[in-house]
């Protein structure tokens, strides 16, 4: 990979820059672009370019969170697809997580954000919108990505729920507090590292010359990551000897099966 820094925050400048350098590369990994600009930038580039374009803050996070939830629900006796999943904070990470959960088959995703346009974006994707109190009362699983330490008070935690408070360095509620308040399982952002996802996602896409990284490929990556976790782990260690190789293979298969392979004349 070649790191390229763009000293400009204008979405048009970023889009034009990436568009102009894209012929040099087999894929583009976008990083550290805030919402809502990240959505426009990725959508335009993904539509125009014939190589994979992926914003890691959205999709790398979403893949590892899905993997973590597959194991957390197993620990807690919940069925992910039948659970109500609450997403607190609908920025880049929260929106990416919401969309991937909906694609995976979770029927009830309810989100909350102070930004009305973020809530509208979730509604357009097929999710529901509510207040923070509504999300905390209804959700069997709560995922928080707000960047607001201490936002979730112990008295707001639903008994038996799964709570992933992912903001770093300080979460919306600490795992200890969530468990003391009655959560069946709780973790913070230190347990969920994007680096479990993006190496295999990009290596797999590049190996088969995929034109994009679609949801089937992301879900395949999440399933592979989840399988490698030890008995009491949410997700495996970054240093697990097989995880990146197996994620790569899973992504390759999903790309081939979903027909996003570049055909040469």
Set out the residue ranges of the language-model regions.
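Short, ordered loop/turn segments at secondary-structure junctions
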Residues: 6-7, 32-35, 56-59, 114-115, ...
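Rossmann-like adenosine-cofactor binding region
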Residues: 128-186
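Glycine-rich phosphate/diphosphate-binding loop of Rossmann-like nucleotide-binding domains
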Residues: 59, 63-147
């Amino acid at each position: 990979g070649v790191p390229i820094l763009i000293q400009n925050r204008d979405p048009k400048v970023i889009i034009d820059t990436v568009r102009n350098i894209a012929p040099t590369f087999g894929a583009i990994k976008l990083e550290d672009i805030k919402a809502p600009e990240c959505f426009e930038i990725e959508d335009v580039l993904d539509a125009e370019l014939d190589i994979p374009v992926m914003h890691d803050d959205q999709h790398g996070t979403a893949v590892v969170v899905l993997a973590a939830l597959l194991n957390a629900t197993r620990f807690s006796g919940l069925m992910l697809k039948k659970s109500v999943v609450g997403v607190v904070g609908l920025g880049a990470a929260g929106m990416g997580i919401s969309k991937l959960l909906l694609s995976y088959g979770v029927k009830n995703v309810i989100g909350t954000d102070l930004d009305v346009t973020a809530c509208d974006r979730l509604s357009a994707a097929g999710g529901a919108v509510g207040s923070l109190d509504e999300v905390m009362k209804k959700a069997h699983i709560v995922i928080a990505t707000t960047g607001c330490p201490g936002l979730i008070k112990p008295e707001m935690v639903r008994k038996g729920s799964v709570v992933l408070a992912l903001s770093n360095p300080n979460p919306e509620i600490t795992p200890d507090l969530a468990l003391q308040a009655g959560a069946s399982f709780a973790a913070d952002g230190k347990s969920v590292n994007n680096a479990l996802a993006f190496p295999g996602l990009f290596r797999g896409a590049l190996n088969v010359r995929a034109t994009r990284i679609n949801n089937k490929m992301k879900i395949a990556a999440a399933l592979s990551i989840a399988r490698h976790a030890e008995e009491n782990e949410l997700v495996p260690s970054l240093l697990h000897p097989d995880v990146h190789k197996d994620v790569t293979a899973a992504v390759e298969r999903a790309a081939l099966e979903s027909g996003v392979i570049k055909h040469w004349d």
